[in-house]
Amino acid sequence: MTADDGRRRDDAAAPGHDVPTGSDGGQPSPAGGGSVQPVLADEGTTSVPEPEPRPKADATAEVAVINKPTAIGFVAPALGLIGVFMMFPAVWALYLGLTNYRVTGTAAREPEFVGTDNFTRALEDPLFTSSLWITLIFMAFSGVVGQMGLGFTLAWLFRRWRGWTRRTIEVLVIMSWIIPGSVVAFLWRAFLDGEGGTLNSLIPGDVTTEWLLRQPLLAIIVFNIWRGTAFAMLLFDAALNTLPPSHLETAKVSGASTWQTLRDIVFPAVRGHMLTTALLVSMWTFNLFTPFLLTGGGPNYQTEVLAIYVYRVGFGQGDFGFGSAVSAVMLVINLIIALVYFRVLRDRRKKS
Amino acid sequence: MKTYLRGSRFAAAIFASVLVLAACGGDDSDPSDDDGAAQEAPEPSDDPVHLTISHNAVRPDVVAVWIEDYVIPEFEAAMAAEGREVTVEHIEGGVDDYKTQLALDLSVGEGPDITSFDQFWTAEFAAGGLIEPLETVVGDIVNDWEGWDQIPEAVSGSLAVDGQQYGIPLGTDGRVLFFRTDLFEQAGLPTDWQPTSWDEILDAARTIQSELPDVIPMQLNAGVNMEEATTLQGFIPILLGAGGDLYADGSWQGDTPQLRETLEFYSTVFDEGLADSDMQLVTDGRDRSFEAFADGNLAIMIESDYLWRGVINPDGGFPIDGREDLVGWALIPAQQPGAGINGQDFVSASGGTGRVINPNTEHPLEAWELLSFMGSYEAQLDWVEREPRITAREDVNEVGIAEDPMQSFVAEEVLPLTWYRPGFEEYPQVSEAIQRMVENVIAGRSDVDSAAQEFHSNLEGIVGADNVSGE
């Protein structure tokens, strides 16, 4: 199968290849021609019974026929579930964070309201500040730089590959993503073990480095890159498929280098996908608990990311009040991350 | 958290952290408050009764085997002989945070009818209203049990708060110095070793270090990952040997000279490489120490007699063939003769376990009958025949450990000079602060000064500044 062959097939299949998160990703018209989005929007409103409706266009049409009480009636069950299973626990955790509630002892029976004591205690705890720092490093290097960088590189390098080679690579990468975390942790501990570990046997000479003790942060960063690259790769793969092939060919014909092509054509086109991916990966990594399975947060707190910190104070020390307070701080940081990304995303849309 | 579907990761990411804690925040009402009827002597149930018992262990753990092969069939048969249909189920365990799980179960009115229990949890669970005195759960009939006469008060008190008995103790233990006689012989050290000061411990370890460079000279538990083992068979015997205590004269002991002596000892041991600091920091460090000792790569350990009866025994996780010849034991000396707590030459520390009845049980009478059956002479004898150890019952001990030299040593030499943990609900938090303190010292995060000061302020945070003495 030639490269051209594959690309044409891919174009035909593109409308089915939906990006899981992107309502912003414009899909190429079969002709692969010029200004994509306006054309499609027009089509959506004029041609009525198409099996694949454009969400935006239909929304305006429906608001006109449904009155407000009916609409509320439709969303009420969903809102109710969200309220019970998401909002209530969140508010409850905020409340617990203001008490000295413990899992055992007098404070379990009669928790007292302690105001912001838990929050000041967290900010004064050097282990909390170092844990926050570790979490941000972990997020930046394993999530944003590692998973996204490697994910994009893989998606770009293999974008024209088809057939069994591509399948093999996809299976290998996705395998690391779908194996249960506990199994993966066991494999990595065996891989990094000092005596008889796979990594040490691959290195020439008599190496007995205990990687999880000597380079713990690096170890969990590499681990997480390995673990999560598949997700970024899949998203970027879908994003690259939305690129009109003619753009790339024009670039090729006019003699643009790979870097120029990436900078001037690919990155601007998939920037929305990148920001969405960055948002998902950052928040996922920020809240990740899996390093616990490798290091337990150690040695001596060196890999204690915030999720592990909360686990240690909440479940290890039984201090649910304090643990809830730190969880609330994590929630706020998550919201800040989300707001930053949404702001950037909106600015980008305004510009375009 | 890792079980969330990727598709919902956006929402999950926001709420995962709070969900976990909030979901467990749970019900803080006390389910047994309205259970006043329990004071009357309960009647045997006419309907079939199903009881659950949990021990946080699986086969081949000897207690799990004993419960499944002896306790359940014998008890069910005894009940059947009375014409009562009682079935018992063993809920297998083997998890790290058993204590938290149990507390959460009990707080929402769930959990097994009978559960094994560590002595030092009693005060905090009782204060939290998670367990109730046996008299409240079952009734006055618990005082008629024949076994109480066989259990010394010091031992039964381990499961009592304010004079009220919460469960039946199983037994007790003691901390000693274990050493490999084969390694001592190779290094030219006496195989009937009994050090009389800290310096003699250090000298023996240094001799091992120079004579047998491939062998880790000693193990002194010092990591947070080793949890209570770091407190009870690491820090405490050293602190007691310096003449210190955890709680004395009505207050908790913070940054005292004895605390600093203790931390200096840790510092010396690890700075000189007499113990392996990696072993303290890894997540499975205690198992690694057992393995090294069993393989002859570690010469000296401060451990509970559990090492002897539950680790290096023929059925244990790290058996040593011929442990009687290859393993020696000695009392833990004070810093100098007479410098230990109460002017002692040697020190030790003891813990213990027991079983309690869930206050939420639907069948308090049957649960008590099962619990007291497990504590009966016949049942306890069957248990120690599987694993010789010091039980709570003196009549069982007379025959149960007679032929085990190590256990007899603990009963005769160690228990008379031992120390028990203070029975306050804050103890487990203090213990955790201790583990962090010693780990910080041996990992180089803190020096002795700052570690002692930090511990002092942590202690004040836990029990209140008025209840701490020291610097």
For every predicted segment, state its role.
Chain A
Residues 1-76, 163-167, 342-352:
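Transmembrane alpha-helical segments of polytopic membrane transport and secretion proteins
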Residues 67-352:
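A structural signal for multi-pass alpha-helical bundles of membrane permease subunits
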